[in-house]
Amino acid sequence: MISTNDFQRALVFQGGGSLGAYEAGAYKAFYELLSERDKNTGREDNIFDIVAGTSIGAMNATVLVSYVKESKTWKGSAERLIEFWEHLATESGIDKIPGFTEWWNYWH
């Protein structure tokens, strides 16, 4: 019989622009579920062995891995990823540049 310690757990994010924001929320729910499940298995310090992504998913993976590398824990990683997306959602002020709206409407 193979024990659960013999398995590696991978987290893979896909690409798709704004889908990355959805992935942040999905990751938070998934992380909470796994954290609760792993409390008695000794995995709580290493929720995922492999983290990968493509396109915007690679950005999500980078945010998570850099957080875990700096803080030495997965705890707080979901909040950090959501914080990243909330920061992206704030106004940039680009629409205040004279002529931008007309340019955008023309090319959009």
Where are these regions (language model features)?
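An N-terminal RHG(E/S)-centered segment typical of histidine phosphatases
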Residues: 1
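Patatin-like phospholipase
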Residues: 4-10, 18-108
